[in-house]
Curated annotation (Swiss-Prot):
Regions annotated as coiled coil: 565-592
Description of how the protein assembles with itself and partners: Homodimer. Interacts with AMSH3. Interacts with VPS32.1/SNF7B and VPS32.2/SNF7A. Interacts with ELC/VPS23A.
Protein's recorded name: Vacuolar-sorting protein BRO1
UniProt region (Disordered), positions on chain: 726-846
Ranges of Low complexity composition bias in the record: 763-780, 790-823
Gene Ontology terms: cellular component: cytoplasm; cytosol; late endosome; multivesicular body; plasmodesma
Record organism: Arabidopsis thaliana (Mouse-ear cress)
Keywords linked to the UniProt accession: Coiled coil, Cytoplasm, Endosome, Protein transport, Transport
GO biological-process terms attached to the record: endosome to plasma membrane protein transport; multivesicular body organization; protein transport to vacuole involved in ubiquitin-dependent protein catabolic process via the multivesicular body sorting pathway; vacuole organization
GO molecular function: ubiquitin binding
Pfam families: ALIX_LYPXL_bnd, BRO1
Record localization: Cytoplasm; Late endosome; Endosome, Multivesicular body
């Protein structure tokens, strides 16, 4: 059956109609008479709002069902506030000038007239359910989202009718002037009808998604059940003569249609399982139900009749096929329909809970209207309730604390758990062990040591490569100096690279010290591996000794003693859970204990009312007293059982061995953390050192490249001089003096070269790697080496002007020298990373 065939075959409820009523003047007069004109003026805006809401309810100003829904919800909340402040009744001291008139939604000639706000609330809830049903019917059920939204709307309609049935129907039908549409029977039927239509939307989505026949059959059967429940109310008094025949026919056909749909789809599943006999019985049952329903289909829509005919044809087709297969192949005996079990059903919907939607507790209207006597009485009653709850809560807390202390004194339940090998660690110790195991545990230390070795090797290789760069450049410079003699006038490599060599030497020293530290760490890991191995036990509780049973037993009663003690502990635990539940019951009862509406309408003595209301807490107080009494007796019983248990199982020796194990685990954790911290210090050191060496290597590479460029230029110039191709003008103005020309004063060397014996700080036991900014490199014009000991205070002489040959651009970027005082602070401290053993520091600690 295609879902589209039933796309418009659902029912919506029409709203009840009402007559105009003036609420403003009677309610204002009541406030003026009961309170004062001042209060009446203060609530005047609220009364105007109420008047406008009632006026909007009377006429349909906005035909949109969603707008009507919102209006009805707002008005219902205000009615809840009116109910608690304005007693509307024929009583002369109440608001007796207001009469509500509402017409039956299904028999509009019938009406109810009451001086009862519950009739007004019941009618508003009825119309709210009707609005939700119209919203559901208005959704486009040819799409997945449309069917889902329609289902939600029908569930909301069912929720509104259920709320009406449970809260207002009985109150609204008291007296001679009532209507059937708000009766318990009618709104109950409407709730089932709306739930059926919500489930039907789910079924349509199930078919559209191509669900399995078994799933579709269960959902279809539940649709039929909901329609059958609605039908059962429609065909009996007082509803059987209240609704049109078309209503009854519609619900009756829908019930039969979805029973047949369930049989049809369940039959498909049976056919796939080759359960042909039951398939035949189910299909016959569905066909019979459809045929029976069609007999009473007078007044039903033609589209619904067509859907039934289509389904009946499909069922008969499958039935004929199944009968032929059974006659030819399976030869199974077909059971009678009466012997079949009920079809499985699965509900996907339920009435929406309207409590939160209709909650008026946050509304501010009429908030000032609380009679003084009622307010004082409410305050006094609240104090009485608080005193009861406070006293009982203290008793419960004391009982729980007493249990905790007594069990701890008896070392329970830990000792009884240890008998079964379920020893437990203290929480803080267990958390420490778990942290160690998460970080890798002792078994993971070897991998971290290998990381140290790898990083050390990388640093050593990087350092060797850097030194080879400088050595190669110095060798080439010496060869050319030997070849060209005094004509090779640029500074020697050893002079320019002294600072770099010093740094590389310090790095080498640091690596040596680090290697010694690594050896100490590895030795510590080896020496303490036995101690730390306990941390690799999983679970760690397996390392804790168990409570051994006695080796010799004369009467073999230890099992009985253990079993009895366990049973007593379980009883004690149940008592604790019961106390928690009792405390929650007290709090929940107080939360729901709202007597303000009663206080605002009572005319008799408050004391009688207080005694009656506070008595509802008595049964919980009695349960608390009984719980505490039973616990006292049980604790005495447990103490006697535990003494016998301790004697038989030698509990004192077990406690001593357990404490020894705890201390061993704690010592292993401390040693692991110490080694782990030292390894982390080493890893951090090697990474920092690698960055520093890489930085120096880059400086050395730049130096070698610049010297190579300078070397080529200088070779060309020297070769020109030697071949007699140089010109005097160029020699006189060039930057390089001739061999017969006095050497111009060279600029003073940087501060570091002026004081080559500048003392470096004493190298620490483990010197962290240095790190310096990468300066640019500038080679002074080649010529005689500059004097490296310029007297203090003597200004350096500039080079003579050079008109012909300009220095290489890269020479202008700075100095190879690292002037003292300009070196940036290293990124690591200069103190020794190791502390002497007697200081208790880690190998790599700064």
């Amino acid at each position: 059956m295609a879902s589209s065939s039933l796309s418009n075959l659902m029912l919506a409820i029409h709203e009840k109609k009402t007559s105009s009523v003036d609420l403003y003047r009677p309610l204002r007069n009541y406030v003026t008479f009961t309170y004062s004109e001042r209060e009446a003026q203060l609530i005047d805006d609220d009364l105007e709002t109420l008047k406008q809401l009632r006026s909007d309810i009377e006429r349909v100003s906005d035909p949109s069902p969603a707008a009507r829904r919102d209006l009805l919800i707002s008005y219902y909340k205000v009615l809840c506030l009116v109910e608690t402040r304005f007693p509307i009744s024929p009583d002369k001291d109440h608001v007796n000038a207001v009469s509500f008139v509402w017409y039956d939604a299904f028999k509009q000639k019938h009406k109810a007239t009451q001086q009862n706000i519950h009739l007004e609330k019941a009618a508003v809830l009825f119309n709210l359910g009707a609005s939700y049903s119209q919203i559901g019917l208005g959704h486009d059920r040819t799409t997945v989202d449309g069917r889902r939204q329609a289902s939600h709307a029908f569930m909301a309609a069912a929720g509104a009718f259920a709320h009406l049935r449970d809260n207002e129907s009985i109150k609204a039908t008291i007296g001679p002037s009532t209507t059937v549409d708000v009766s318990v029977e009618c709104v109950g039927m409407l709730e089932r009808l709306m739930v059926a239509q919500a489930q039907e939307c789910v079924f349509e989505n199930t078919i559209a998604k191509g669900s399995t026949p078994g799933v579709s059959a269960k959902i279809a059967r539940q649709v039929g059940i909901f329609y059958e429940e609605a039908l059962s109310a429609l065909i009996i008094s007082p509803l059987k003569d209240h609704f049109d025949k078309g209503w009854i026919s519609h619900v009756q056909l829908k019930a039969a249609l979805f029973y047949g749909e369930a049989c049809f789809r369940y039959g498909k599943e049976l056919h796939e399982k080759e359960e042909i006999a039951e398939e035949i019985a189910r299909l016959r049952s569905g066909a019979s139900r459809l045929a029976e329903a069609k007999k009473s289909s007078r007044g039903a829509p033609a589209q619904l009749i067509e859907a039934m005919n289509t389904l009946e044809s499909s069922i008969n087709g499958n039935l004929d096929r199944a009968v032929k297969e059974n006659d030819r192949v399976y030869l199974m005996r077909v059971p009678s329909p009466s012997s079949l079990s009920p079809l499985p059903a699965f509900s996907m919907v339920k009435p929406m809970n309207m409590t939160d939607i209709l909650d008026a507790s946050k509304e501010k209207m009429f908030s000032i209207l609380v009679p003084d006597s009622s307010a004082k009485a409410l305050s006094r009653y609240t104090e009485m309730v608080d005193d009861v709850i406070r006293t009982q809560a203290e008793r419960l807390q004391q009982a729980s604390e007493l249990t905790r202390v007594r069990l701890k004194e008896m070392d329970l339940p830990d000792s009884i758990l240890a008998v079964d090998g379920n020893s437990a660690l203290p929480v803080d110790l267990k958390e420490d062990v778990e942290a160690v195991q998460i970080s890798g545990g002792p078994a993971g230390l070897e991998a971290e040591l290998q990381q140290l070795r790898d990083l050390k090797r990388v640093n050593q290789e990087l350092l060797v490569h850097t030194e080879e760069l400088l050595q190669k450049e110095a060798t080439e410079d010496s060869q050319f100096r030997s070849q060209f003699g005094t004509r090779w006038t640029r500074p020697q490599s050893s002079t320019l690279t002294k600072n770099l060599q010093d740094r590389l030497n310090r790095f080498a020293a640091n690596l040596k010290q680090a290697g010694e530290s690594d050896v100490k760490i590895e030795r510590s890991v080896r020496d303490n591996s036995a101690l730390m191995s306990i941390l690799d036990r999983r679970p760690i509780e397996s390392a804790v000794p168990t409570l051994a049973r006695p080796i010799m037993s004369l009467d073999a009663t230890e099992d009985a003693i253990v079993g009895t003690l366990k049973q007593s502990l379980r009883q004690l635990e149940n008592l604790g859970a019961q106390r928690a539940g009792l405390e929650d019951m007290l709090k929940e009862m107080k939360r729901k204990d709202d007597i303000l509406p009663k206080l605002m309408t009572i005319t008799g003595s408050y004391e009688d009312m207080f005694r009656k209301e506070i008595s509802k807490y008595d049964h919980i107080c009695e349960d608390i007293s009984q719980n505490i009494e039973v616990q006292e007796q049980l604790l005495m019983q447990i103490q006697a059982q535990n003494e016998e248990f301790s004697t038989i199982f030698n509990l004192e020796d077990y406690k001593a061995s357990k404490e020894k194990c705890y201390k061993q685990i704690q010592a292993a954790i401390m040693k692991y953390r110490e080694i782990k911290e030292n390894i982390n210090e080493g890893l951090k050191f090697y990474v920092t050192l690698q960055d520093a060496i890489t930085n120096v290597k880059q400086q050395c590479s730049d130096f070698v490249m610049t010297r190579s460029i300078q070397c080529r230029d200088m070779i060309e110039d020297v070769q020109r001089q030697m071949s007699g191709l140089s010109f005097q003008d160029h020699r006189s103005s060039g930057p390089y003096p001739s061999v017969h020309q006095p050497t111009a004063s060279s600029p003073p060397p940087p501060p570091e070269t002026q004081n080559p014996s500048h003392p470096h700080p004493h190298a620490p036991y483990y010197r962290p790697p240095e790190q310096m900014s990468r300066p640019g490199y500038s080679i002074p014009p080649y010529g005689p080496p500059p004097p490296y000991h310029t007297p203090h205070g003597q200004a350096p002489q500039p080079y003579p002007p050079q008109a012909q040959q300009q220095p290489h651009p890269s020479w202008q970027q700075g100095s190879y020298y690292d002037p003292q005082g300009q070196q940036p602070r290293p990124p690591y401290p200069g103190q020794s990373p190791y502390q002497p053993p007697h200081q208790g520091g880690g190998y790599y600690r700064q």
